[in-house]
């Protein structure tokens, strides 16, 4: 089945290139997320500029565009190595989307969706790690960084044959968050609660 893997890689990249943040903001009449807030077309920035409803829509779509190509390849019996490349292709499409001038998000939700087909137990643990980190720290970016660091160890425990591809995916996410890591180190990163507070003050209901 690895013969179809190159085509699946291209398909995954094209799926990832559909920027839900930009499309949702256009449909909802919101500012372009690439030019507003943090400038990152992802769910967290859409939460800042558009509120919870728009952010949830972006989050769900971003998860699905990582999940569906990998799930399809997994069902067809593609080997773990190629599955890893397909997952990375979906994230690369999200980060550098061919349909939107190669300016995309950071790939966290798409990576989470790409890992989900490995197993719901792993998915639950990963989601719990992100949520717990965000609740304790208030930093969405720190939740993504911690989850990316721990993901290979979780996978090694649940399904060790996928450790290498998930490690590659984690490296991509960490590289994409290098600016956030620097801001966290300098204590200049904005907490997600602050973003929500500013949104309420700007648009009181």
From Swiss-Prot:
The keyword Isomerase does not apply. Keywords: Cell inner membrane, Cell membrane, Lipid biosynthesis, Lipid metabolism, Membrane, Phospholipid biosynthesis, Phospholipid metabolism, Transferase, Transmembrane, Transmembrane helix. GO terms for biological process: phospholipid biosynthetic process. It is found in: Cell inner membrane. The chain crosses the membrane at residues 4-24, 56-76, 81-101, 112-132, 138-158. It is a multi-pass membrane protein. It catalyses: an acyl phosphate + sn-glycerol 3-phosphate = a 1-acyl-sn-glycero-3-phosphate + phosphate. GO terms for cellular component: plasma membrane. GO terms for molecular function: acyl-phosphate glycerol-3-phosphate acyltransferase activity. It is an enzyme of class 2 (transferase). The keyword Transferase applies. Belongs to the PlsY family. Probably interacts with PlsX. This is Glycerol-3-phosphate acyltransferase. It comes from Citrobacter koseri (strain ATCC BAA-895 / CDC 4225-83 / SGSC4696). The gene is plsY.
């Amino acid at each position: 089945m690895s013969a179809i893997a190159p085509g699946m890689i291209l398909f995954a990249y094209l799926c990832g290139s559909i920027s839900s943040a930009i499309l949702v903001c256009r449909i909802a009449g919101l500012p372009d997320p690439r030019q507003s807030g943090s400038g990152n077309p992802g769910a967290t920035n859409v939460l800042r500029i558009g509120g919870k409803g728009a952010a949830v829509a972006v989050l769900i779509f971003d998860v699905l565009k990582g999940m569906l190509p990998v799930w399809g390849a997994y069902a067809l019996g593609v080997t773990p190595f190629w599955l890893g490349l397909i997952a990375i292709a979906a994230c690369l499409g999200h980060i550098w989307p061919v349909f939107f001038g190669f300016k995309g998000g950071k790939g966290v939700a798409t990576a989470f969706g790409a890992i989900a087909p490995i197993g719901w137990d792993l998915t639950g643990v990963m989601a719990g790690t992100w949520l717990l980190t965000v609740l304790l720290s208030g930093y969405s970016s720190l939740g993504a960084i911690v989850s990316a660091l721990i993901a290979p160890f979780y996978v090694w425990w649940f399904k060790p044959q996928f450790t290498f591809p998930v490690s590659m995916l984690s490296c991509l996410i960490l590289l994409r968050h290098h600016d956030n890591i620097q801001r966290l180190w300098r204590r200049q990163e904005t907490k997600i609660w602050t973003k929500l507070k500013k949104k309420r003050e700007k648009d009181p209901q």
